[in-house]
Amino acid sequence: MDFDFVFYGAGISAKIAAVSLLKEGFKVCIIQDKKESSQNSNLVTFLSEGSINYLTTLISNPANIKTYTTIQKLNCSLANSTGSKEEFIEFTDNKSDALGKIIPNNILESMFDEELSKLKNITIIKDETPIKINDASMNVEIFMESKNSIRAKVFILSSSNNDEMNKNLNIKFVSHDFNQIALSVRVIGQGQSEGCAYQKFSSDGPIAFLPYEKNEASVVWSVRDDSPLVSMNKSDLEKIINKKLNSFCRPLEIVDIEKYKLKFSFSRKLYSNKTVLIGNIAHNIHPIAGQGLNLSIKDISLFVKFVKNYKSIGYEINSSFIFEDYDVERKVDNTVYSFGTLALEEILSTQNKLVNAVSRKGISYLQKNNFMKKLFVGSATGKKYFNSL
């Protein structure tokens, strides 16, 4: 079987990229990773306003996205290691009153599964695992465990679960273990202000309240591996979360709890020969800034733009010029957000009194500096980036 693009991995990023390429008339195959998590996860994603605008061009019923709560404000606080008053900072977008939306991952996946089911030229393989690729010739040949093989002009790797395949890439990765577990807690309840997300930084780790429907929200708390919170029962954890967030939220009731190991990974290049990286394998960052999927959507939109533009002037869709331009154009943004969140998590969760005092002064300064806050919001919402495509 021959395709224009073959994906290994069927996560949200892969499905978004596949739909985008299919709508440009390309023939696409998705090989589903057997280790990928079920759609029943309670995880949520913050989608910036720019990402939402892009995604609504890809799906038949964009109203499905618009039903979720619009986030108009993000309030952050930094606890004082000495126990005195917290420092606060508020981010808003005064031009549009919208920073983005928080949407459950399973809803996003369902939207793009539905879109894939409506499109032609899509093949989904569920019972195979690629074990080797040969991308040194004009096309890429992908060899399966079953000894079958398929060919494509471009192989897109969006799964990080196949160590053997990753080793064969001519790409270096930067890795870091946060020694943290993310507690993803689905709750019933509301914040004190409608359309406002909250994040609190303390020595226990960053905790965020992320509302996505009128009376439903997610609490994400990144705690150390050895924290007693990891094994705490629902009732006791509910009491602690309510105490932690009582200045931001009305009483919250826990529905369910999931736990995820947090690790950092950053690819120094986004391609190797005719293999392209998209999604978490390209940059798996701390959830502290809520930018993980937004970075991937920026990657996807630019990659598809380059493929379309180069093809229109006679280049093959696996031309090295496409891959080089894609890598160079996305380098700065991906590096800044990936390593910026790595440093930010270390600084804001520290128990060092001097670092905490300096951080508090920095937050106090930033709260008073509307110009700096405007720059931050402009970058986080991504609207300028998507408008430039």
Q: What label would you give each PLM region?
A:
Residues D4-V6, A10-Q72, N106:
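Glycine-rich FAD cofactor-binding loop and adjacent beta-loop-alpha segment at the N-terminus
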